[in-house]
């Protein structure tokens, strides 16, 4: 089975994706290994710094004006939050882009 970062970087390479959004950074290892030219990370556990937004995803999406080629959702795993992240991600996804969802905790 391919590792998450291999899948993400493979999609970037295969599709020529330039911009990447990651919701939920964990320890930041995967985010730092992403090869996209432009990348934004969103996680309330981090401070606002550089390309990292230290906020909940709902707050980020209200203020966001950018669009992305690839969006990886791995924030809160509650089904309602993931649903909001999908809806909000769809609104800022470039044509021909991809949304990846890591996992969801039903109810």
What annotation goes with each model-predicted range?
Residues 1-72, 76-107:
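A short alpha-helical cap/connector motif
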């Amino acid at each position: 089975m391919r590792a998450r970062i291999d899948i993400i970087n493979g999609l970037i390479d295969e599709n020529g994706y330039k911009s990447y959004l990651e919701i939920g950074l964990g320890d930041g290892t995967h985010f730092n290994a992403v090869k996209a030219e432009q990348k934004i990370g969103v996680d309330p556990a981090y401070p606002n710094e550089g390309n990292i937004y230290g906020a909940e995803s709902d707050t980020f999406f209200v203020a966001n004006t950018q669009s992305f080629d690839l969006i990886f959702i791995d924030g809160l795993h509650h089904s309602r939050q993931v649903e909001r992240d999908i809806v909000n991600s769809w609104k800022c996804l470039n044509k021909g882009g991809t949304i990846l969802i890591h996992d969801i905790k039903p109810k």
